[in-house]
């Protein structure tokens, strides 16, 4: 995880009046969650499940997916770095401007990274550059808030079967525009969809709170 991410209140001893360094939604009533955690506090005396299979199975049932298609991670950040590591050395395009962690993770794992500032049009056959094998898209985007229309994105994915699309929907609860559901994304064999509970529920310190679902092979 890169330095300078923000929300680093642990560095300061004085009270913080206003925090503009993070886009976590702060007006969430966490009283029920805190009460639940208090009832489970005795669990700190035991090791947790080595792999979060129980939670993954629960999320899979919720999204009507096979359990092996869901991967729970320590925030979306871990999912980003694990994805970059799994596909190390890939020719990667990142839709810009966007969250800098995608490029950091990819460069750490030897990706050949290029920036993409516009999407191909119908007149171009919706084709991405020939050398691209992985595309990262934050949708809705951080920091611009723009949303790529679901219909266009589906067309783009269909016309580029050689590309693995990593779509980060961490901000999906901050828009009324239609986005891919897990079931819709699962119809494509080349999509990896990232979800995060951090932003909506304001729990960045509670891990794991993010999960990924995928339908593509990893070899």
What are these regions (language model features)?
Residues 23-25, 76, 139-143, 172, ...:
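Short glycine-rich anion-binding loops that position phosphate/pyrophosphate groups of nucleotides
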Residues 18-20, 93, 114, 166, ...:
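Hydrophobic/aromatic beta-strand patches that form the interior of the parallel beta-sheet core
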Residues 1-47, 131:
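N-terminal "arm"/small-domain region of PLP-dependent enzymes with the aminotransferase-like
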Residues 85-139, 143:
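PLP-dependent aminotransferase-like
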Residues 212-218:
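Conserved small/polar residues in nucleotide/adenosyl-binding loops
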Residues 55-91:
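Phosphate-binding glycine-rich loop
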Residues 121-131, 143-203:
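Active-site pre-lysine segment of PLP-dependent enzymes
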């Amino acid at each position: 995880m890169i330095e300078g991410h923000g929300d680093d209140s642990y560095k300061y001893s004085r009270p913080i009046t206003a925090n503009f360094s993070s886009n976590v939604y702060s007006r969430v009533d966490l009283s029920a969650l805190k009460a639940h955690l208090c009832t489970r506090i005795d669990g700190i005396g035991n090791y947790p499940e080595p792999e979060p299979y129980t939670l993954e199975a629960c999320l899979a049932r919720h999204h009507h997916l096979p359990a092996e298609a869901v991967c729970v991670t320590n925030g979306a950040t871990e999912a980003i770095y694990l994805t970059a590591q799994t596909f190390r050395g890939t020719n990667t395009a990142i839709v810009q401007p966007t969250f800098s962690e995608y490029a950091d993770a990819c460069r750490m794992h030897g990706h050949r990274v290029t920036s993409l500032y516009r999407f191909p049009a119908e007149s171009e056959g919706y084709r991405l550059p020939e050398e691209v094998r992985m595309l990262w898209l934050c949708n809705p985007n951080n920091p611009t808030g723009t949303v790529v229309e679901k219909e266009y994105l589906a067309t783009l994915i269909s016309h580029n079967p050689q590309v693995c699309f990593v779509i980060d929907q961490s901000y999906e609860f901050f828009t009324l525009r239609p986005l891919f559901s897990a079931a819709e994304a699962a119809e494509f064999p080349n999509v990896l969809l990232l979800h995060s509970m951090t932003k909506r529920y304001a729990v960045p310190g509670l891990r794991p709170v993010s999960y990924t679902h995928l339908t593509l092979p990893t070899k």
